[in-house]
Amino acid sequence: MIAIIGLLFGIILGVVFDVNIPERFSPYMSVAILACLDSVFGAVRANLSKSFQADIFISGFFGNAVLAAALAYLGDKLGIPIYIAAVIVFGGRIFDNFAIIRRLIIEKYKSRQWGD
């Protein structure tokens, strides 16, 4: 629940404050944002599975973002579009986590509905 509240708070802050990111940083920011979203979806999944740990979430949130942006920067300096691989990996993980979240919610709903 903390992850969802944090995500909503971040979205509201992003809408209220007009933050312009220079175009040259957009590949790094996009990969970092995907990494953060991956951590948020992972936290929601862990929370529904009753295995959420705040320290794991926070370290993964910032660690994934920094690592993804650093790899995108390194790839840019080497002339290799590494950020595309990061987008594919994080995108796949986000969809996997979403599928698991969906199943967990449906299973909880069914168990409450039928009183299991």
Predicted regions and their residues:
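Charge-biased, low-complexity intrinsically disordered regions
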Residues: 1-32, 36-116
